[in-house]
Each structure stands twice: as structure tokens, then as C-alpha cells.
């Protein structure tokens, strides 16, 4: 197959843990031909969604993370529907530029491209708001533009988490308690004087045991979660915020949440999702660029990238040579 990855610059990948790298490596090992482009390079020419693609191949040892790992060939312009699969792996934030990219991906799908995850699915599933579709699994939550409502929510629950709807990697997340002397200042900064919508949730003490990432691939739940355990004094378990990743078996509650969401995600055209769970509560549904493949594979000997590429091959109607 010819597979196009829409991703951030490959030279910036941390190959020892990067999930997109793991996907690429697995696809390359199977003999697929790989191409890379940036989301900002998507264009429409004569009605056709196109981009500047760069063919690349792997070089060096698989476990050599200290030297160059790829070599590129001459870039060229190509329509997205000329590839067997297009894998969208651009990191958030989900800003207007990201929105435009998903709209172009939807147009490309209408022209016959196989895009994972679909542009429509990424638009429909805001990674924070998506949990509201599953109220049976979430902690007390409000979404509001008004600081006064957050203060009332804080008064009721005494200890809360507030976060923007378009963040990633734990950026912009604050823990507030009723005794915090900086409540007004924090809300003014985060909510921009009642002009920015945020989410507030009751604080979940189980965060000290880890913010668990549960992966769902084409409706199949990976049997291990990556618990991202915060540093001492932190309330954010995100790896980007310094959290430590520990792969562990799913609990009964984890399975209940994941098994409920999995068929709905598949129905919505979401090939890969990352469910974030703290304790017994679902906190996010990540559909833009979920991570955790390498940590789970290394710690539990469960090949997540193979499961993912299997799913891509199925949806692209690929049949390996006998």
C-alpha cells in the first residue's frame, strides 16, 4: 500500500516513545510505501484535495534513537485520493487551522480518499466535550463561559479542575480549591474575562494513581492501559507535563467504560481513540493524535502498532501477497 502520514515534522519525533513513529515503522516493516506531509500543506487545486508529499524510508537500526532514522526522496504534488490510506497524526491544539484541515480531509474522503481518523469524526468529537455523550461515566461537570458559574461550582464541590476545551498535554489545566487566594486571577486568565468557554470538573483524588490512557482501535479495546502518574506535587499526569507512564491491565471499570464506547466510536468512523480515565471516571476522548503505543508494547509485550496497521489494511481492502 501507499500510505500518507499527515504529521508534524519527522525530524522532531522522539523516536523512543513516539506513536506515529511506531505506526510508520510497522507499516514499513510490512513493505508498505510511506509518504509524509504537513497539515498546512493541504491545498485544493481544480477541486481536488492535494498536498506536497515527501516519500521516505527508514535507515539505521530500529532501536537506535540517537541518529537519523529516515531518508527522503524528492517531494511531489499528489491528490489524497491516490493513496491507499491517509493517516492524520497532527498534534493538537484543535484550533481554526486544524478545523480547516479536517474540512479538507472530509472533502478528500468525498473524492475517494481513505482517511483515518475521518475529518468529520475529529470535528464531532471535541476531546473534552465528547465525554458529555456518556454521562454515566463522568464526574460532576459543567461547561461555561462565565466565571461566576465556576465559582458556584467550586463552592459546591470545594475542589475542582478547570481546563480549556482546545488544549493538549495538560496545558492550561488548573486545580482550584475554595481556599485558593488566586481564584479570580486564574479565572480571568483562563476564561479571558468571560469570553472563553471552559470545562470544570470535580477533582478526582485517584489522579495520584495515574491518568489512564485506554486505546480503542477499530472497535477493539487494547487490554492494557497506560497509567500516566503525576510527579510529586502535580495534578496532571500527562507525559508532556512530566508524568511517568506505567502500562497495566484494565480494571473491571476500565473495561465497562471502554466496551461501552468502542462500538459508538467505530460507528462514528473513529479508527483510533484514546480514552482518558481517572479512577472510575472518563475524563477525555482523544481522537486527533492518541499516544501510548510504544510504552504499552515495551512494558506488556502487546504490539499495539501491529493491531493498528491491521485495521488500516482492513479498511483499505489490502490483501497481503500469499
Q: Model-found features: residue ranges?
A:
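Extreme N-terminal starter segment of soluble prokaryotic enzymes
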Residues: 1-4
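ATP-dependent carboxylate activation and anion-phosphoryl transfer catalytic cores
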Residues: 6-7, 13-16, 249-322
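Short glycine-rich anion-binding loops that position phosphate/pyrophosphate groups of nucleotides
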Residues: 9, 91-93, 165-167, 290
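Conserved N-proximal alpha/beta basic substrate-recognition cap immediately N-terminal to
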Residues: 11-13, 17-29, 35-140
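Phosphate-binding site of ATP-dependent enzymes
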Residues: 19-20, 147-148, 155-159, 169-255, ...
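Short glycine-enriched loops at secondary-structure junctions
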Residues: 119-123, 228-230, 278-281
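Short acidic-hydrophobic, aromatic-tinged amphipathic segments that line or gate anion-handling sites
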Residues: 141-145
Amino acid at each position: 500500500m501507499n500510505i500518507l502520514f499527515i504529521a508534524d515534522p519527522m525530524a522532531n519525533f522522539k523516536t523512543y516513545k513516539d506513536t506515529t513513529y511506531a505506526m510508520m515503522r510497522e507499516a514499513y516493516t510490512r513493505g508498505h510505501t510511506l509518504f509524509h506531509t504537513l497539515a498546512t500543506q493541504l491545498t485544493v487545486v481544480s477541486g481536488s484535495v492535494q498536498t506536497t508529499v515527501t516519500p521516505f524510508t527508514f535507515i539505521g537500526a530500529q532501536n537506535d534513537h540517537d541518529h537519523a532514522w529516515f531518508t527522503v526522496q524528492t517531494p511531489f504534488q499528489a491528490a489524497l485520493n491516490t493513496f491507499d490510506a491517509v493517516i492524520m497524526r497532527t498534534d493538537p491544539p484543535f484550533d481554526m487551522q486544524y478545523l480547516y484541515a479536517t474540512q479538507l480531509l472530509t472533502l478528500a474522503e468525498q473524492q475517494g480518499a481513505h482517511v483515518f481518523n475521518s475529518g468529520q469524526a475529529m470535528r464531532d468529537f471535541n476531546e473534552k466535550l465528547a465525554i458529555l455523550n456518556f454521562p454515566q461515566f463522568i464526574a460532576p461537570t459543567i461547561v461555561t463561559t462565565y466565571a461566576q458559574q465556576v465559582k458556584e461550582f467550586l463552592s459546591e464541590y470545594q475542589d475542582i479542575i478547570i481546563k480549556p476545551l482546545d488544549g493538549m498535554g495538560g496545558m492550561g489545566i488548573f486545580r482550584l480549591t475554595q481556599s485558593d487566594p488566586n481564584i479570580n486571577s486564574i479565572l480571568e486568565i483562563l476564561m479571558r474575562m468571560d469570553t472563553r468557554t471552559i470545562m470544570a470538573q470535580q477533582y478526582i483524588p485517584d489522579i495520584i494513581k495515574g491518568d489512564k490512557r485506554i486505546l480503542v482501535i477499530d472497535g477493539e479495546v487494547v487490554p492494557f492501559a497506560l497509567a500516566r502518574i503525576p510527579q510529586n506535587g502535580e495534578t496532571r499526569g500527562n507525559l508532556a507535563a512530566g508524568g511517568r507512564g506505567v502500562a497495566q491491565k484494565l480494571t473491571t471499570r476500565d473495561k465497562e467504560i471502554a466496551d461501552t464506547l468502542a462500538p459508538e466510536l467505530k460507528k462514528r468512523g473513529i479508527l483510533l481513540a484514546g480514552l482518558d480515565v481517572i479512577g472510575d471516571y472518563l475524563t477525555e476522548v482523544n481522537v486527533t493524535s492518541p499516544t501510548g503505543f510504544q510504552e504499552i508494547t515495551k512494558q506488556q509485550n502487546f504490539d499495539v502498532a501491529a493491531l493498528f496497521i491491521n485495521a488500516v489494511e482492513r479498511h483499505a481492502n489490502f490483501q497481503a501477497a500469499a
